[in-house]
Design a protein with these regions (language model features):
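N-proximal low-complexity "stem/linker" segments adjacent to membrane-targeting elements
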Residues: 1-24
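Short, acidic, metal-binding catalytic loop of nucleotide-sugar glycosyltransferases
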Residues: 23-32
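Short beta-strand-to-loop acidic/aromatic patch adjacent to the donor-nucleotide binding site
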Residues: 86-98
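Conserved donor NDP-sugar-binding/catalytic core segment of glycosyltransferases
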Residues: 102-134
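Short, flexible, basic/aromatic active-site loop/helix in glycosyltransferases
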Residues: 120-127, 136-163
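Acidic donor-binding loop at a coil-to-helix junction in glycosyltransferase catalytic cores
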Residues: 189-195
């Protein structure tokens, strides 16, 4: 018997893209999970699309509404809701992302293998850009990771795990570790660095999985440019740009 695993997807104004995310989750090779979609106040039909999918999904689906604005609040509400209902493993992606078919299986394998948190590989969505755009996105990930390693706030001697940049849209964590570090900051994005460093102070059990692949929307790259997007992924904010470029 498998341990309960829930996939949590925060969503805001994603009526144009959430169908792709849900289709990708339905195509997982490991479908022994419950899907929880946490809507953050959408007015564009996102919730209706989620409910339509739930009616025929190949796994249990629940849809919540989180009125407190911010992806951190939506994720925290979703994770705690899942934990209260027996989840021991939690995976997260976003409503504009496309998890590859082995994503859930890789997340489960990483957590079962002893990791407290597993972070995966990010790629650009193939339906949003060509080869040049995907190469630019790969360069962005490398740049953001290199910049992050140099930041003083990521180099504290109290950290028990080495720095590696990750985006919240491709991660998995045990329920015990999530609760032990106090959960996701309940605030608007960016939140990933705060959460990541809470984990790094608490445990060395952070793993990277090349098999845990998510295709990421490049809307932010198109809106901010490479350096601006790198700053965003480093949790330095949007520097006056629209923090939610939909």
């Amino acid at each position: 018997m498998t341990s309960p695993l829930w996939v949590v997807v925060p969503a805001y104004q994603e009526a144009d893209r959430i169908d792709g995310t849900l289709t990708s989750l339905a195509a997982q090779t490991d479908r022994d999970f419950t899907l929880l979609i946490v809507d953050n106040g959408s007015t564009d039909g996102t919730v209706e699309r989620a409910l339509r999918f739930a009616a025929t999904a190949p796994f249990p689906v629940e849809v919540l509404t989180e009125p407190e604005r911010g992806v951190g609040s939506a994720v925290d509400t979703g994770f705690r809701y899942a934990i209260d209902r027996g989840a021991t493993m939690l995976a997260r992606t976003d409503a504009d992302c496309l998890p590859h078919p082995g994503w859930v299986g890789a997340a489960r394998a990483g957590l079962r293998g002893g990791a407290g948190m597993v972070i995966g590989q990010l790629r650009a969505r193939r339906d949003e850009t060509g080869a040049l755009g995907r190469a630019s996105f790969r360069a962005l990930v490398v740049l953001a990771n290199a910049m992050g390693k140099l930041r003083p706030s990521n180099r504290d001697s109290a950290f028990r795990a080495p720095y590696r940049m990750h985006a919240g849209n491709n991660m998995a964590i045990t329920a015990d570790l999530y609760l032990a570090v106090g959960g996701m900051p309940r605030q608007p994005a960016p939140t990933d660095q705060i959460f990541r460093n809470r984990i790094r102070r608490h445990t060395p059990a952070v793993a990277y999985s090349r098999s845990m692949v998510v295709e990421n929307s490049i809307r932010r790259l198109a809106s901010y440019g490479v350096l601006g997007t790198a700053r965003w992924y480093l949790d330095q904010g949007s520097r006056g740009l629209d923090p939610d470029p939909r």
